[in-house]
């Protein structure tokens, strides 16, 4: 029966994988719904205050670029050539060999430069033209050939064209998407969890599918009780910090994180899914690798380490078991539990796996940085070639003996190793950091330029164009059977109680990596959600075309902000009523959907603006003269933050003006005014 359950778990998992690759959006069991266009009023202020609506910020986001491009192609004829040229350059930069780059660069020169020069319409500088002409004439077609044009294209788009985008419906759509992004609160309900694929000291790793996009991930779940029992809180929090550091920027050689969240019992990391097994497993199945095969893995691992070191992260646990293969055979470095940020202070702790730890790591109290990873790389490459660590002779398991050898023994390399390989390993395995390859000040560049990697095109490596020596079997899970992986004994943690102070440690644990979320959305549901939203908005416009539109009412007045909020209504204050609010310098107005009657509360009647909580939801409490109070709730985190801020600032400014105003202005007034028609509003209503 257990065997049957294992087979069914594997089949279910593999089917989910195949369907997610073919049509991930079709596999989505939850729908992403964009908020109404009126969200723009709040989101524009929210993003502007955080410096998030500059040209560079929007243009360099995946969703921002797509919307800006769409706007230019459909609305701004003069910008079409620049945008198309920009996209061509980006595609050119991805080309992996010189012949293709030469062919494409000549085509681009003819289409976007020469044609405009002949018609005297070329808008770019003489220096940019001469740069490309000079390099093309010498057939020097590096990936950065058109870089001067990238800079000038961006400069030409960031002025009036970007300002027009900011006034367009495409910017409104950008605000809608950003509202969704900034209001993500994940739980287990947002994932379909499949079979277990691994287990570590604190928890398990599962294959899972994200419910709203259909994308497959690995979910690493750490048991909070087990973490507490082993006093591993610092390690767990450190892993989340290290993953957040290395998961920004595009690095295809690290198992990166897209989300982190926690439940009352678990800490969850949502990571890149690797279906090809680990190098330790394949070493046992395949046997040792040849120099050529090892060179392939070394080159990809070097780029992974280079990315980490650029982020000032030292990995500290490089070994075959932590190198995972994807389904095509390319590798990524996984498990950053022991990684450390050395940007401000160098570590000195003795951590890692015996047989791979650098001498300076073993010497307690000695500070080190990325140097430790280059020594570990030498140990790991030796194992791929010989089947054991250079300091683990005769299969000894005595950790002290392994450490002693690491600190004292000069590694004897086999005669069968080529001179180039011997030079590489001797350089990496230097006990003296100052003499070690990668530690002269050039970092990964020193390894890339080593004779062992002669002929390697590192751009080709980065684009994963070299054929892997080993391709994991298709249609298999490439992980141990779920029953072989086993499970934790619940009795171990039976006496462990999680207290409020334990949970407080994880209050800042949730995280979402913006660029990775946007990439996930664009790959899966972006077009479908936009199309559906366009239909909904078109129907609403057709239905409400005779009614006074929200933005029309606010336009031309000194309305600070407007948008939907929920107001606690009815005589017993038990029902939430959705209303549209307008904040002016001297009043707050609101009305129900489709209503012409306008309610008004002046700043003079408000006694305080406070933050409160109702059923674990943050709310805004307005205390009004006469003992009344208004409770408002927002539909997203950014809306709550901005409404609370603007209401507080407006109230404080109104109170300041009231204190300076003549006393006759302080005569009692009705707390709430109702109008059958919208009140008259002058262009400047700051007078009280």
Swiss-Prot record:
Catalytic activity: [beta-adrenergic receptor] + ATP = [beta-adrenergic receptor]-phosphate + ADP + H(+)
Region (N-terminal): 1-190
Molecular function GO labels: ATP binding; beta-adrenergic receptor kinase activity; D1 dopamine receptor binding; G protein-coupled receptor binding; G protein-coupled receptor kinase activity; protein serine/threonine kinase activity
One GO process term, biological-process aspect: negative regulation of G protein-coupled receptor signaling pathway
One GO cellular component term: sperm midpiece
Assembly, per entry: Interacts with GIT1.
Name recorded for this polypeptide: G protein-coupled receptor kinase 3
Organism: Rattus norvegicus
């Amino acid at each position: 029966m257990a065997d049957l359950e294992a087979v069914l778990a594997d089949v279910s998992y593999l089917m989910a994988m195949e369907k997610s690759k073919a049509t991930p959006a079709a596999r989505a069991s939850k729908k992403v719904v964009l908020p109404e266009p009126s969200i723009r009023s709040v989101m524009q202020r929210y993003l502007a205050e955080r410096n998030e609506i500059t040209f560079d910020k929007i243009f360099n986001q995946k969703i921002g670029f797509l919307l800006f491009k769409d706007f230019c192609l459909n609305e701004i004829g003069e910008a079409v050539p620049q945008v198309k040229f920009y996209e061509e350059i980006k595609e050119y930069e991805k080309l992996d060999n010189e012949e293709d780059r030469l062919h494409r660069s000549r085509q681009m020169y003819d289409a976007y430069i020469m044609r405009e020069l002949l018609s005297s319409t070329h808008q770019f500088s003489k220096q940019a033209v001469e740069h490309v002409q000079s390099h093309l004439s010498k057939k020097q077609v590096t990936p950065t050939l058109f870089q001067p044009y990238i800079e000038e294209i961006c400069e030409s788009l960031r002025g009036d064209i970007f300002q027009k985008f900011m006034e367009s419906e495409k910017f409104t759509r950008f605000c809608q998407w950003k509202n969704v992004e900034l209001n993500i609160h994940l739980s287990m309900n947002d994932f379909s969890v499949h079979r277990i694929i691994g287990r570590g000291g604190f928890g398990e790793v599962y294959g899972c599918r994200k419910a709203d996009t259909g994308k497959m991930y690995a979910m690493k779940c750490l048991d909070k009780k087990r973490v507490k029992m082993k006093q591993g809180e610092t390690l767990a929090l450190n892993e989340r910090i290290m993953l957040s550091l290395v998961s920004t920027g595009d690095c295809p050689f690290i198992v990166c994180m897209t989300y982190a969240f926690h439940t009352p019992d678990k800490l969850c990391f949502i990571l890149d899914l690797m279906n090809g097994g680990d190098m330790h497993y394949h070493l046992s199945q395949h046997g040792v690798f040849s120099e050529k095969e090892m060179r392939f893995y070394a080159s990809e691992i070097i780029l992974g380490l280079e990315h980490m070191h650029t982020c000032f992260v030292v990995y500290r646990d490089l070994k075959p078991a932590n190198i995972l293969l994807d389904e095509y055979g390319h590798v990524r470095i996984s498990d950053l539990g022991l990684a450390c940020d050395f940007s401000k202070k160098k570590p000195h702790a003795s951590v890692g796996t015996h047989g791979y730890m650098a001498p300076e790591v073993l010497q307690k109290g000695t500070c080190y940085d990325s140097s430790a990873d280059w020594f570990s790389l030498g140990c790991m490459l030796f194992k791929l070639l010989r089947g054991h660590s250079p300091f683990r002779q005769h299969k000894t398991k005595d950790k002290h003996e392994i450490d002693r050898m690491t600190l004292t023994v000069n590694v004897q390399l086999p005669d069968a190793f080529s001179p180039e390989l011997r030079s590489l390993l001797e350089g990496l395995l230097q006990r003296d950091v100052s003499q070690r390859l990668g530690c002269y000040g050039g970092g990964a560049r020193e390894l890339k330029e080593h004779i062992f990697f002669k002929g390697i095109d590192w751009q080709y490596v980065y684009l994963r164009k070299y054929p892997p020596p080993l391709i994991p079997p298709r249609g298999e899970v490439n992980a141990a059977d779920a029953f072989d992986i086993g499970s934790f004994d619940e009795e171990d943690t039976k006496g462990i109680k999680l207290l409020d102070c334990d949970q407080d440690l994880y209050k800042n644990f949730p995280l979402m990596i913006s660029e990775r979320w946007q990439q996930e959305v664009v790959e899966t549901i972006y077009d479908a959600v936009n199309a559906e939203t366009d239909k909904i908005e078109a129907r609403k416009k057709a239905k409400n075309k005779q009614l006074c539109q929200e933005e029309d009412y606010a336009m031309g007045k000194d309305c600070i902000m407007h948008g939907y909020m929920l107001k606690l209504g009815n005589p017993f204050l038990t029902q939430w009523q959705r209303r549209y609010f307008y904040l002016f310098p001297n009043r707050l107005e609101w009305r129900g959907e489709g209503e012409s009657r306008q309610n008004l509360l002046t700043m003079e009647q408000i006694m305080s603006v406070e933050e409160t909580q109702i059923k674990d939801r943050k709310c805004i409490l307005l205390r009004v003269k006469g003992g009344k109070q208004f409770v408002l709730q927002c539909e997203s985190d950014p809306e709550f933050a901005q409404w609370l801020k603007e209401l507080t600032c407006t109230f404080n400014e109104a109170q300041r003006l009231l204190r300076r105003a003549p006393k006759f202005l302080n005569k009692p007034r009705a707390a709430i005014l109702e109008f059958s028609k919208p009140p008259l509003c002058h262009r400047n209503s700051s007078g009280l």
